[in-house]
Amino acid sequence: MSEDLPSDVVAVITQLCEKTRQALSEGDCETARAAVDTIERVATNKLPEGEHRQTVRHACERIAAVLADDETDDALAYVEALERRFPAAP
């Protein structure tokens, strides 16, 4: 995506995605849900309006929905897709 993203926000979201992945791999859906809620809040409050914010928020909604159905494999796939939306850390 061509939007300039604040590096501190990208770092926070990336860390939260890692936390979500780890929680899912350990079967800790509660921690995963909390991390996804935080990602959505960070995106809403800190990312500039535009396609990237909308994409992140949509991904968070989908992750929350599949977690509500205890579909951890699907949630993990969404988290990994979300991580690919961010540039690699320098």
Each model region followed by its residue ranges:
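Acidic, polar-rich N-terminal leader regions of halophilic archaeal proteins
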Residues: 1-90
